[in-house]
Amino acid sequence: MRLARIIVHLVVIAAAMAAPARAASGQHAGGDSLVVSTAWLAARLGDPSVVVLHVGHGDSYDKAHIPGARALPYREVVTRRDALGSELPPADRLRALLERLGVSDSTRVVVYGDEPPMATRVLFTLDYLGHERISLLDGGLPQWRAERRPVTRDRPRVARGRLTPRIRPEVVAGADWLQAHLGEPGIALVDTRTDGEYLGAGERHGMPSAGHLPGARQLEWEQLFRDGTHLLRDRDELRRLFADRVAPGATVVTYCWVGYRASATYLVARYLGYPARMYDGSYQDWSQRKLPVRGGAAP
């Protein structure tokens, strides 16, 4: 008996030591993680508790999609408001859309898109609605196809879902909120745009100003992904990218031009355990309000 207790004790210690090692390996977690692998999804195709959304433009869904995936045109998850072209639609409209796609309160929603920010914008929207069971498909459809997994052109039959929105206003940052909190040590403002846009040397797109919000540090969203793919960098690499720009425990607030690219950085911030918000109106809103901006490389 004493020997048996010793063996059990050693097994428990070994398991405890192995868990941090797995977390530090850079492998993305499955199950309840914000990021799931193609293998994780492949093992659950046909599971009625998992809804897969293919977010895109045009006819990309009809050309090829993951079996069972439902088509979600990107234009349906954004709306135009106050001269801003990419804002959150009303909650009732979003609920009706998602219920039509078969999403219920207990559904695990796995999302991929023609571009990574299409998927992450939908995940941000689901987060805003308070739907907790959400995941990004790491690698998206390109990785799925590279692994020779099945695709189809068939549209699945979808039973209507029943979704209860539980709005989380704390994941959204507006201009007034930002003006009240800029410069606070617990707020890390992250500009997810290109070098030219951040420096103020890029195209203004008709806006009255160019540059970045005061105090913002740049982390272009594409740096979060392996070059030319929809695959996120390993978790340790992502942590290093954020550690260079975000103090431990700070709330990450992301923005881009219209709240599209910023959603990718928002999602990764959450994946790494940071509290996060996204400025939905982003630079377009800030510039139209003629609020202060900075040019050059300094935050």
Model-derived segments and their meaning:
Residues 79-105, 221-251:
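Helix-loop module immediately N-terminal to the HCX5R catalytic loop
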Residues 27-37, 43, 78, 141-214, ...:
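Active-site neighborhoods of enzymes that stabilize oxyanions during catalysis
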Residues 30-58, 68-72:
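Mature N-terminal segment immediately following signal peptide/propeptide cleavage
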Residues 7-19:
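Bacterial N-terminal signal peptides
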Residues 240, 249-298:
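C-terminal soluble interaction/assembly domains
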Residues 86-181, 202, 211, 261-282:
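Thiolate-centered catalytic microenvironments shared by cysteine-dependent enzyme domains
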Residues 21-26:
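Boundary at the C-terminal end of the N-terminal hydrophobic targeting segment
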